[in-house]
């Protein structure tokens, strides 16, 4: 499908590789690392033994309407959501495995008790030994959510050094320097990997449209502040068109209307 057409791999020296140009079975040799492209829209890094030791950083950039997965040199798997970026070393050296996330990523971390795996997301470090978790750190939100599926993670604020430790089924929310922890339905926050939107109880139209604009590459205008706060809850497949989703929300709430004009959608209240 066309969602995979625009992913870019940025090499350390500025070389840009359009990931849509590679079909399954392609292998790129880059010094000390082999990059395998496979047909499921994912890329895998593999260390070449005996190669020179320089560690380089690559960045995968996923645009609106896109998703991508990669397997890092240690075997850890990362799923990246639309409008997200991951900067990572081509192989892990030293005492830790550190990657840098903008946007949203779901991580299945390979166990290595000697080398903690750290996701740096804006003001927060998420530190793990081996686990499955989701980090949501989109820039406009000013909120960073870490949701733990299995294992154990420690989340810390790099400035205040405040720390939160999660057990499976918990989510920690970072907002302006402080953490709050709550029990959540984990599958709700990882639904995007299974091709679904999940709008939890009490989700406002502002929060919902933020997800929709990244996936459908559209922009929303609200006719009033009041409309922004209307709520809708439910699980909807991402294979639906934007118009089908608007129609579901209209029928369910019976108080809002979506008016589509090209890539701009106006959301108004039905008086």
Residue ranges: model-predicted function:
Residues 1-271:
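A residue-level detector for the "anchor" residue at the start of short, highly conserved motifs
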């Amino acid at each position: 499908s066309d969602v995979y057409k625009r992913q870019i791999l940025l090499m350390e020296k500025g070389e840009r590789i359009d990931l849509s140009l590679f079909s399954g079975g392609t292998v790129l040799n880059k010094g000390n690392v082999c990059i395998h492209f496979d047909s499921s829209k994912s890329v895998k890094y593999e260390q070449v033994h005996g190669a020179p030791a320089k560690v380089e950083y690559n960045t995968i950039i996923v645009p609106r309407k896109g998703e991508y997965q990669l397997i890092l040199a240690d075997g850890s798997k990362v799923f990246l959501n639309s409008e997200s970026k991951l900067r990572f070393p081509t192989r892990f050296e030293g005492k830790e495995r550190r990657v840098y996330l903008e946007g949203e990523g779901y991580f299945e971390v390979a166990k290595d008790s000697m080398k903690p795996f750290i996701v740096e997301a804006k003001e927060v470090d998420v530190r793990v030994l081996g686990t499955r978790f989701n980090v949501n750190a989109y820039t406009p939100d000013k909120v960073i959510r870490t949701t733990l599926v299995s294992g154990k993670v420690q989340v810390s604020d790099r400035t205040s050094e405040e720390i939160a430790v999660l057990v499976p089924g918990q989510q920690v929310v970072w907002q302006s320097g402080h953490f709050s922890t709550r029990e959540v339905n984990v599958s709700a926050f990882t639904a995007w990997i299974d091709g679904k939107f999940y709008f939890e109880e009490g989700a406002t139209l502002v929060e919902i449209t933020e997800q929709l604009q990244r996936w459908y590459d559209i922009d929303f205008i609200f006719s009033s502040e009041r409309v922004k706060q209307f709520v809708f809850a439910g699980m909807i497949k991402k294979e639906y068109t934007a118009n089908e989703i608007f129609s579901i929300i209209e029928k369910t709430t019976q108080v809002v209307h979506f008016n589509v004009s090209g890539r701009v959608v106006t959301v108004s209240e039905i008086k």
